[in-house]
Amino acid sequence: MNNIFSKLRDFVGLNEQVEYEYYEEEADTDNYQNLYQQENPQPAPAEAAPNNRRWREPMTTMGDDVAAGTKSAMGNVIGMPGAINGISEVLVLEPRTFEEMPQAIQALRERKSVVLNLTIMDPDQAQRAVDFVAGGTYALDGHQERIGESIFLFTPSCVQVSTQGGVIHEVPQPPARPARPASTNPPAWGNETNRMAQ
């Protein structure tokens, strides 16, 4: 049983090792000029200064193509796959074995909806497959819905699921800040400060 959960965590990415990049400090003696020798000043080289390892050139992200003209304060944000272009994708899987289930989790990680048709699979394997994908969906904050006999819909958190009867799963909207009512009365603490000053 523990083996199934560890495989699920490995696939979803909860057990991924964090890799840190370490840089060696280099003496940048080429960047300093000898300030005490004024007799033979050397002209500055025409080529660009050597890059310091600590500072890298900014990398382009998927969102740079769309928002090239706008400069935002959050320049280090990397776009989610599928979020920039606004195109939603649905992956229909009809697996024959349990070994095909990681494809469904990977699609959910890429913010794609998954329709899982398990009519071909053995009932015990189908139950195991639904449990596996449901666990991955829960770990990714997604939603699941049974839409037929052995047919299931798994969606990422950015997808709203609804039927003719109403909304089954609604995408949470960020709470709007309530506007402060304009107060005509001065605050009570302001009067006390004036009394203290007198």
Swiss-Prot record:
Give the GO cellular component terms, alphabetically. cytoplasm
- Outline the segment boundaries, as ranges, of region: Disordered: 170-198
**What subcellular compartments does it reside in?**
Cytoplasm
Name the cystine pairs: none
Look up the domain of life of the source. Answer: Bacteria
Q: Where is the composition biased (Low complexity)?
A: 179-188
One Gene Ontology term of the biological-process aspect is: FtsZ-dependent cytokinesis
Q: Which UniProt keywords apply?
A: Cell cycle, Cell division, Cytoplasm, Septation
Keyword Cell division in annotation: yes
Q: Which PANTHER family match?
A: CELL DIVISION PROTEIN SEPF
Family listed: Belongs to the SepF family.
Instruction: Describe, as the record does, how this protein assembles with itself and its partners.
Output: Homodimer. Interacts with FtsZ.
Q: What does this protein do?
A: Cell division protein that is part of the divisome complex and is recruited early to the Z-ring. Probably stimulates Z-ring formation, perhaps through the cross-linking of FtsZ protofilaments. Its function overlaps with FtsA.
Name of the protein in its database record: Cell division protein SepF
